[in-house]
């Protein structure tokens, strides 16, 4: 999980865009853009018309998510507001930790797909050059993925291997997309939402 940078460029920093140059890295990579206050007199005001991006997703758009970048701290009894994508990235890291606590079988790749697929679309429709997949939606991410998508799966299928604990896990989001599901391992995974993904579903022990 990398910070996009704070230079308001059309693309993110060099570390954030590494999978563009080394594609094998993408399965474990999330770039985090930040939204900060346009007006210094309205710092911490998260009304949409007061927010601006600190960077652009650019070449990293397929692995970018956006969240708020303002951070509050009290110094000598006074509230201070700091901003930067370095404050945005920990929000995504914390979200990944919460998802992993609920779904311990998830690999880093599945955590990435879950976080990106559940983002709220903002800016231009779809995955765009500024916000990537959109605004971090923690509540939705904690319900499992919302897309089985070839752009996220980096192939035709999403691969899930349950952890062998024979527990019952549940995905509560509706799941759409153009990829399929390959489910392995022991345990039970229930898809409670409406599943309209277009790929095949294959379930087996290996």
Task: Describe the residue ranges of each PLM region.
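Active-site environment of divalent metal-dependent phosphoester hydrolases
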Residues: 6-12
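Extracellular S/T/G-rich loop segment that most often corresponds to the catalytic His/Ser-adjacent loop
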Residues: 18-97, 101, 105
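Extracellular repeat-rich scaffold modules on cell surfaces
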Residues: 78, 85, 90-91, 98-101, ...
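Outer-envelope exported proteins of Gram-negative bacteria
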Residues: 3, 112-116, 200
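Residue-level detector of functionally special positions within alpha-helical transmembrane segments
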Residues: 5, 84-86, 132, 137
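C-terminal subdomain of the subtilisin-like protease fold in secreted/lumenal serine endopeptidases
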Residues: 28-31, 42-43, 101-169, 173
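Active-site neighborhood of phospho(di)ester-bond hydrolases with catalytic His/Asp-centered motifs
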Residues: 1-5, 32-33
């Amino acid at each position: 999980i990398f910070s996009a940078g704070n230079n308001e460029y059309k693309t993110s920093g060099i570390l954030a865009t590494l999978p563009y140059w080394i594609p094998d890295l993408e399965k474990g990579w999330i770039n985090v853009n930040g939204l900060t206050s346009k007006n210094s007199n309205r710092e911490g005001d998260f009304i949409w018309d007061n927010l601006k991006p600190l960077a652009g997703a650019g070449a990293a758009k397929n692995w970018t998510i956006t969240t708020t970048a303002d951070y509050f701290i009290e110094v000598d009894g006074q509230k201070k507001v700091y901003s930067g994508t370095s404050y945005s990235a920990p929000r995504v890291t914390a979200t990944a930790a919460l998802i992993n606590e609920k779904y311990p079988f998830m690999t880093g790749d599945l955590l990435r797909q879950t976080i990106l697929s559940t983002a709220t679309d903002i800016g231009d429709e779809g995955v765009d050059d500024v916000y990537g997949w959109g605004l971090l939606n923690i509540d939705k991410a904690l319900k499992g993925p919302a897309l089985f998508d070839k752009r996220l799966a980096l192939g035709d299928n999403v691969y899930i291997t349950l952890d062998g604990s024979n527990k019952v896990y549940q995905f509560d989001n509706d799941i759409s997309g153009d990829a399929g599901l390959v489910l392995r391992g022991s345990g039970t995974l229930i898809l409670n939402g409406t599943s309209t993904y277009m790929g095949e579903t294959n379930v087996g022990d290996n």
